[in-house]
Amino acid sequence: MLKFFLKLRKRRRPVVVPRFVRFIVYVVLFTVAVQRVKQERDAHLRRYEERLQKNRARRRQSFP
């Protein structure tokens, strides 16, 4: 049984991924990463702007 498995492993050659396929995969991963960074930045900016508006409103109330 073990010999059979060893023979199978020897016969299987390493999987060769064509260069253009690898390139496409890298491009997809890169675009996903960029989108995620953009989303994070947008959310951060939105939170920052909301905080600024709250502070302005608070200032307006305290100084009529």
Curated annotation (Swiss-Prot):
The keyword Transmembrane applies. It is found in: Host membrane. Its main location: host cell. GO terms for cellular component: host cell membrane; membrane. The chain crosses the membrane at residues 15-37. The keyword Membrane applies. It is a single-pass membrane protein. Keywords: Host membrane, Membrane, Transmembrane, Transmembrane helix. InterPro entries: HHV-5_US34A. It comes from the Viruses. Belongs to the HHV-5 US34A protein family. This is Uncharacterized protein US34A.
